[in-house]
Amino acid sequence: MRIDLLTREYPPHVYGGAGVHVTELARVLRSLGPDIRVHAFDGPRKPGDEGALDGVRGYDELAELDGANAALRTLGVDLQMAAHTDGTDLVHSHTWYANFAGYVSKLLYDVPHVVSAHSLEPLRPWKAEQLGGGYRLSSFAERIAYENADAIIAVSNGMKDDILRSYPSVEEDRVHVIFNGIDLNEWRKPSTEDEKANQARVLKEFGIDPDRPTVVFVGRITRQKGLPYFLRAARQLPRDAQIVLCAGAPDTKEIAAEVDTLVKELAADRDGVVLISQMLPRTDLCAILDVATVFITPSVYEPLGIVNLEAMAMELPVVGTRTGGIPDVIVEGETGYLVPIEQKTDGTGTPIDPEAFESAMAERINAVLADPGQARQMGKAGLERARTEFSWDTIGQQTLDLYRALVG
């Protein structure tokens, strides 16, 4: 059986959770036997690049669309992808960036189309800041793919509910919940001499004190990640708490400016505020997470949040917003705490009472910081939950079973 995976991100060009998901899914599916082909953005992979494997094809944007709206350039890549999926038994697309390629492949070659829902355009209206009129185009591409897909994979129960609410014409029996996963062999505490030496280098380079209680945020600077709410909540944390922000790749100039101002204000009021704006390799991120006390996910929209699984794999308690798929990951009072939130129903996820949300967030972070023993127990429980509930082997087999049911 030949399976073609269609994706915006694939090594060496991985920017977020969807890229991590496709990379790991392709790896485990190959081990289960199918012929896996990967079609990705960002051009052909060069020999020696991570991701330069047999069956991986990268596409450049069409030169004729140079300077056009970003969403239009995306559809140009999608059409190239669809031209090269002939001969497959099934196409599986990830995010709106590749969904149109899956839809066109289904029409051209009469093969099943599976869509994985990592996010939903109707629940990200702030994308209009980034794409302008292209947001209407991205929304169209997603809607037509979802309404015509043979199966939709939701990465959490919260995401399934969001799909059915956002696209009422989609029948519930077409939506299957298969979680994101985590590779515990990759996400682990530094143990070898080389890893510990690298950790010492990383901590020194960024000025991180391993002996201070530390709160860590990891994520892109986007509206959905909710970083401004955490930066305001951080004013209520103990003065000895160190705040490490692994935050970069802002969606827009507006959100970048807002975060920059809030970080400067926080740093002017207290010491121990560390901003790391570049994307870190996994080993460096593990080095930082290893000395953390608690991980924070202040998102106002989060289908699941692979970063939560990464933090749990590093034995960290997680404090996250009670929204989207986060409650599928965090067990309240056992692996961390859920922050209550009342949100506007206009699709933005904006808290109705931002100050109450920020205070509730600070309260739960402070509860972890105040009890190091309980924090360690939560971290151990989180690791065990990651091991038993979010194994890539399990997720790969569930996905392959769905493929087989569709192909027959």
What are these regions (language model features)?
Residues P317-G320, I330, Y337-L338:
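Short hydrophobic beta-strand element within catalytic cores of glycosyltransferases
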Residues V20, P213-F217, T222-Q236, A257:
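A conserved mid-protein helix/loop that constitutes part of the nucleotide-sugar donor-binding site
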Residues G158, G181:
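Carbohydrate-associated surface elements
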Residues M1-P47, G408:
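N-terminal subdomain of nucleotide-sugar transferases
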Residues V300:
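Aromatic "clamp/platform" in nucleotide-sugar-dependent glycosyltransferases that forms part
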Residues A256-M279, T283:
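Nucleotide-activated donor-binding/catalytic signature segment of Leloir-type glycosyltransferases, i.e.
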Residues C286-A292:
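Short alpha-helical donor nucleotide-sugar binding micro-motif in glycosyltransferases
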Residues V111-P112, P122-I144, D161:
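Nucleotide-sugar donor phosphate/pyrophosphate-binding loop at the beta->alpha transition
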